[in-house]
Amino acid sequence: MSKKIAVIGAGIAGLSAGCYARMNGFDVEVFEKHTLPGGLCTSWRRGEYTFDGCIHWLTGSAEDGAFYKFWNELGALEGKEIVDHEEFYRHEFEDGTVIRWFTDADKLEEHLLTISPKDELPIKKFCNSVRKLSGMKAPMDKPFSMMGFFGIVKMIFSMLPYGNVMKFAQHTTVGEFAEEFSDPHIKESFKTLLYDESMSLSAILFTFAGLHNKSSGYPVGGSLEFARGIERRLLDLGGIIRYKTPVSKIRVEEGAAKGVVLENGKEVSADYVISAMDLKTALEELLNGRMKDSVYEKYFNTERLFPSCIQVSLGVDMDFSEEGDYLTLSIPVRQPIAVGGKRYDTLQFKHYAFDPTLAP
């Protein structure tokens, strides 16, 4: 008789865990309080328009990408067209200056040098790092704990060519590297490339590395359709998904999870439980705070909060196909906006003319 796994949450993590559990012979039952799969990887339908809420670029969208093997096994990209943007970010300033952060590192280097030749050193340092990391193939076949001695040695040797770049990137923030630019427009624009200038520079470098080698594209159809692909795969494998079925408690016997208690009071037994939901809620509510972990406690109590983000989506009867092939456009505002205690002088704009499935 097969052993059973109960999965809490039908987001990408929960659906993926369910798929791989079924591939390895486990019975799987997924419990999701929403009516749809995907969790945060979602879209909203309003009339004839679809407003996307998650995927801007997908790591591993190309066949030579490290994550492609997993997306392919999960059915996430089956029949999907991938769009690779020319520009990751376009920043327009009030004085008319436009900084275009091209996804191609060669094109980006040429553009930035045209704007500020005196910044040749940091420009080439950034673009060379992107090109270097774009060739990195991270070992993804096994988790570190299962690699064994020779597997670990092989991994270490495969990563040696990238050691200097990674060490520099991990110990430098976005804001710190921005200060290496003397041009005020490039400096300001670089600080706003991602959500917060206190983030590690490695986040930007790895993002641009994936964009440069065209393995971080956008799957046409949007985020919910992407999640639907994994949902179909799980169902085809024989997994069960229970929507509108919130879990109120994880049942623990002799220190081991042995099932879940649903909000309606029903108990479901399982040999293993995978919590693919908000970790803080799982530990404090579903486990009643009984399972303490010093690492997670540190994250909960000492780490900085992620910056606030507000998305306003508009379905308009206009053709934006000539607007430009960029992922995000940053434009100045006449009056600064305060969100979450922080002041913003720009608005970031996206159009989805590149995805014909989202509008009539």
Spans of model-derived segments:
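Conserved active-site beta-strand element of glycosyltransferases/polysaccharide synthases
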Residues: H91, I241-Y243
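N-terminal glycine-rich phosphate/pyrophosphate-binding loop and immediately adjacent elements
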Residues: K3-G135
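Active-site/ligand-binding neighborhood in enzyme catalytic cores
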Residues: R131-L237, K244
